[in-house]
């Protein structure tokens, strides 16, 4: 019925093979090191910035959407006492989520996005980061523990400082006042979620 966005996977060729080199079987590679290589992170970020409009249908067809206009108030509401105020708006394109495997990787990508966007003002996106503080490891039954998005007290100091700086960037973009304290962090988490839907 054309009411669902298509799911599309792009495969990008990342390397050529030399026919004159004998291929040798190995047990495995250091995947984490390969995925977190600065050159890889730089190239992936560059690709996303260059193709963001195309992949999210920016500048293409428009549609009418009931946008939430009081996001900060709704995010700060503890008892669902604030009524959502929505307004019909014509919108072009969709928002995007970029998920990575670890907090250190999230930090590297966040910094790389900031660096590349500062170097090329034509490629400005509103980038936020959020991550859980727990060890998102599988339990013996194969099920992941629930993350507790309401508390940052278990974050190591480096991660908390990083998240505090990222939230400060977010506050500057959206004129909000969040931080990593328990109540304000929960509201930041909700605010990011609401803006993604909007």
Predicted regions and their residues:
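Conserved P-loop NTPase motor "coupling/switch" region that bridges the ATPase
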Residues: 1-4, 25-33
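A short acidic, often aromatic-flanked loop/helix-cap motif at beta-alpha or helix-coil junctions
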Residues: 14-18, 135-138
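Post-DEXD/H (motif II) to motif III coupling segment of the RecA-like Helicase ATP-binding lobe
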Residues: 1-17
């Amino acid at each position: 019925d054309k009411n669902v966005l298509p799911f599309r996977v792009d495969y990008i060729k990342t390397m050529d093979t030399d026919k004159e080199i004998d291929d040798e079987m190995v047990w495995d590679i250091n995947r984490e090191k390969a995925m977190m290589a600065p050159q890889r992170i730089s190239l992936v970020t560059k690709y996303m910035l260059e193709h963001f409009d195309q992949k999210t249908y920016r500048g293409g067809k428009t549609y009418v959407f009931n946008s939430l206009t009081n996001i900060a108030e709704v995010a700060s509401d503890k008892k669902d006492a604030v009524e959502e105020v929505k307004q019909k708006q014509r919108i072009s394109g969709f928002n995007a989520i970029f998920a990575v495997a670890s907090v250190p990787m999230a930090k590297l990508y966040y910094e790389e996005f900031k660096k590349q966007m500062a170097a090329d003002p034509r490629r400005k996106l509103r980038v936020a980061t959020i991550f859980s503080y727990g060890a998102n490891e599988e339990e013996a039954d194969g099920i992941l523990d629930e993350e507790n998005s309401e508390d940052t007290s278990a974050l190591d100091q480096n991660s908390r400082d990083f998240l505090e700086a990222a939230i400060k960037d977010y506050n500057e973009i959206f004129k909000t006042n969040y931080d990593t304290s328990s109540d304000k962090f929960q509201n930041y988490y909700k605010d990011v979620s609401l803006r993604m839907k909007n």
